[in-house]
Amino acid sequence: MENEFKLKVEDVQDKITKNTKAIILNSPSNPTGAVMEKEDIKAIADLSMDHNFLIISDEIYEKIIYDKKHYSPAKYSDNVITINGFSKTYAMTGLRIGYLTANEEHTEELFKIHQNSIACANSTAQKGAYEALTGPQDEVHKMVSEFKKRRDLIVSRLNGMGYETVNAEGAFYVFPKIEDENFVKKAADAGVVTVSGAAFGSNGKGHVRMSYANSYENIEKAMDILEERVVNG
């Protein structure tokens, strides 16, 4: 839970070698909900120029941020491939439509792979994505406001149970510190689905990912179940 799960420029700088070709950034983060600070984004972007490596920036949750602002490394470096889509911001997961942006050199190389892999997203999905992107954004703001309420609820309840939980700044996940290796199974047996932090790599051990992409009422119910049947059961 160091730095509230936020990647710092020092973490990257220490790992760069002459063999470094690319790094992946994910902010806001799945599974932690962390949002990187502007100064770290900019500093890592500067490193990509100094050491000539690519940043692959996964920004699928860029609009789901609470009380902060999203910063893309593409604003500060030309060595960036930005990945984004419509699944999260516009709740269009079933339509499977996304996009990337990059400089012309990288786009030409990416197109060679793309044109021999798939043709294009279906026209219905493309039209839906266009309307979502160009239309009123009121519903997006409402959804983010509702996610914030759900976040406040789940963070408060988990901390109240004794599970140290960082206040997520984006996306719709929390990553509480839970050492019990059997917690995920106990929770599932009680009817609450969670994901072991180890599923996201060795650094995730000792944590559990929980999503609050559900109704406020269902989250309350889930927290009651965990408290009664897993924590105190």
Predicted regions and their residues:
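PLP-dependent class I/II
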Residues: 1-233
